[in-house]
Regions:
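HhH-family (HhH-GPD) DNA N-glycosylase catalytic core used in base-excision repair
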Residues: 1-182
Length: 182
């Protein structure tokens, strides 16, 4: 589980992500282990309201995630599913409408697509957002496709070292860096 790796054999992101996981409290590990299951329950509710698939429900939840806290994200997904007006970024609403027909394919951004897949149960999906960039000391909060893939690979590598799914490792690092599960 805690294999000793020579520091020259890992990337900076792997090193920093590994340090986050090693500093995790039991409460943080518990939060991370259930976070996506709880998010999936929201997506299942949205899907049920709309009479559609989990893929579509998760994609709608993810569509409202950019620049939103989780509670607001959930409220907007429920409002959308219930046909109520949704305020906020117009692009998020466009993605949610497209998700009704296209599911995951409506989400062109790496982050929103991976988030929908993780919510829908893909344990290998890794979401790289501002907090994951900061945890890796990335030079930007908005990674290029290449940097996104590098950070995602680093999470997967560290997850494997600790016997975690990549999705759970990402949630754990996020909770530690962000300071809460919200």
């Amino acid at each position: 589980m805690n294999t000793i790796i020579h520091p020259m054999e890992i990337t900076t992101a792997e090193y920093l992500y590994n340090n986050c996981i090693l500093q995790a409290t039991l409460a943080q590990v518990e939060q991370a282990s259930v976070w996506y299951f709880e998010a999936q329950e929201v997506a299942e509710d949205v899907a049920e309201i709309l009479g559609t698939s989990l893929e579509v429900g998760a994609s709608i939840v993810s569509a409202f995630s950019p620049r939103e806290r989780w509670a607001s994200n959930v409220a907007k997904a429920y409002a959308f599913a219930n046909g109520k007006p949704v305020a906020g970024l117009s692009n998020n609403l466009k993605m949610a409408n497209a998700a009704l027909e296209q599911g995951f394919d409506a989400l062109k951004g790496q982050k929103t697509n991976a988030f929908a897949r993780a919510i829908a149960g893909d344990t290998n999906a890794v979401v790289i957002d501002v907090w994951m960039c900061r945890a890796a000391n990335a030079p930007t909060d908005s990674p290029s496709k290449g940097l996104y893939n590098t950070l995602s690979d680093a999470v997967t590598s560290v997850a494997n070292e600790h016997g975690l799914s990549p999705r759970t490792a990402q949630a754990l690092i996020w909770i530690i860096k962000r300071g809460s599960a919200e």
